[in-house]
UniProtKB/Swiss-Prot annotation:
Segments on the Extracellular side according to the record's topology features: 1-21, 124-289, 400-568
UniProt-annotated location(s): Cell membrane
Gene from which this protein is expressed: PRM1
Organism: Debaryomyces hansenii (strain ATCC 36239 / CBS 767 / BCRC 21394 / JCM 1990 / NBRC 0083 / IGC 2968) (Yeast)
The protein's name in its UniProt record: Plasma membrane fusion protein PRM1
Bias (Basic and acidic residues): 624-637
Amino acid sequence: MKKQFLNYYEILSQVWFNKYTIILVLMTIKIYLFTNSILSNLTNFKAYTESICTSLDTYSTVIASLPEQLSKVINHMVASTLNSMKMQSLKMLMTIITIIKSLIVFYIDIFLGTYICILTAAIGGTVDFALDSTQSVLKSVNETIISVSEDIQDGLNGLSKVINTLLSGVDKVKSFFTNQDTDSTEYVDKVNLSIKALQNIKIPNSVLTDIDNFKDKVPDFNELQNTSKLVSKPFEIITQELNESAHFKNITVDQLKLASTPPVNFCSNSLDIDKFYSNLAKKVQFTSNIIIIVLLIMAMFAIASLVVVEYFKWRKSQRMINEILADKNQESYFVSTRNIMNKYNSSLIYYIEKFVTIPPSRKDNLYWLLSYITTPYSLTVLIIGLAGLFTVMLQFIILQIILKSFKSLTTELTGFKTQIITLMDNATSSYIKETNSYIGSQQKSINDELFGNIRTASTSVNSTINDFLMKMNTTINSVFANTPFSKPVNTLVYCTIGRKLIKIEQGLTWIVENLSVSLPQLPKNLTEDFMTNYSKDNHGIHKLTDNVTSGITFLLDTYKKSLLIELYISSAILGIWILQIIIGLTLIWYRSSSNCKARKPEKIQGEPTIGNPKPLTTEQRKEYGYPHIDPFNEKVDASSSIYSL
């Protein structure tokens, strides 16, 4: 009889397309297609990123030029403000200079002229009064002296005779004692001369001439009247210098510096898109190749493993036949044969039986449950579910590599905003610093050139006023120093002129010490305010970077959704296999309940006998999976593959 089964070597010819290898090959194909899809999308997204990058650079350049554009507007405002303020200050200052000069000159002229007239009139009237009084006094004195001298002369003439007689006697007595002659007429002459001198006493008319001449010596202050010209001269000089000063020419916008526009090519220079996507594609391709190689190795390993498995299954089939033949005389031959076949058909039960000791009370239910969940149908569901989960995991690994790389790209794109803000902040700060420095130099020039001249003029006027006061005092003292008019005149001049001039001098001194201008400068927080407003309003750059990040997110989300669908499907398939466990446990519970009912004693009618089971036909053996030959009547060929089922 020819054999109708496959031997071991014939079975090996079909091992290479076993279900495990086929699943691994399908997983490899899935990974390959997934990788190609990602690489294709990366190529498309590379072009999109380059387009966005170009737009980002263009927009960033426009944004970075905002400080320069802003500085142009500010420069116009600063130049216009400085020019207007300088011209208005110049006009106001020249007006003030003219007013001050005119007031000082007017004040000096009006008081000096007024009080020269007052002094001249007062002194002239006083001199005239003194002259008239002196003339009357002189006339009266002269007449009195002449009258008195004549009366005295008459008395002296009589007295002279007596004295002369007496003197003659005295001379004689003296001559008697001294033997010298004495001339007594000497004394008479002296007496007569004294009377003549008294007669000649007369207040000269030159006194009247001196008093009259004193009136002509009243100071006219002609030298002091030149003070007006001296006071006016510094003001005229400063007016001329201000008109000729170059610092008061109009400031042009070109003289002010503009905020620099930094070159902004972050995306083009800092971000090498070609290199990024090339490296990313290499990473994806490398990871995919590794996964595919591993899967192919696993497929080859599955083939090799099944070769070994088939070998052991062939050996187990021979042992199974031997055990069946050994149990052919047992009463439970049918159940025992099926248990033996089940043990050898299930590798899991076979090795548990071989290496694990299980209580007999639980062995049947455990082996039955293992047989139920490891049938070819259940194992197919389990393998497909696990293979699906494993495939999803591998695809997630590839996707995670892309996600990690894109995070660095997104970080760089997001960092562009910070870099642009930093550049704009530096440019704006530098511009504000330079502009404030220029305004400070203009302020110094105005204080030095404009108010410096004012201070010079004030000092000169102060000096002139001091000279004026000194000359005025000198002039007055030269005339009235030793006269009764000295103190009143000095008091009058001080109260009317000197006091006012001292106040003017104090005012000019205050101007010298306090005259300065402080120009307003650009606020330092202008940069902070500008950058704060920019950060709130820079939707453009946000939109561009968000387009890239949203595109990346959309791409990754699409693949994630696809993988999640695969994950759900694989989990559902695996859940079906887990459901088999629940069904198996339910069937065990149901079978245990049925067995308990079957064990209940029933009333037996008649004498119990044990019947002989009816042998199965050939068709029934084939239907139930038993050997379709009778092992008791025919010789069994143990090389049949039927026992490997």
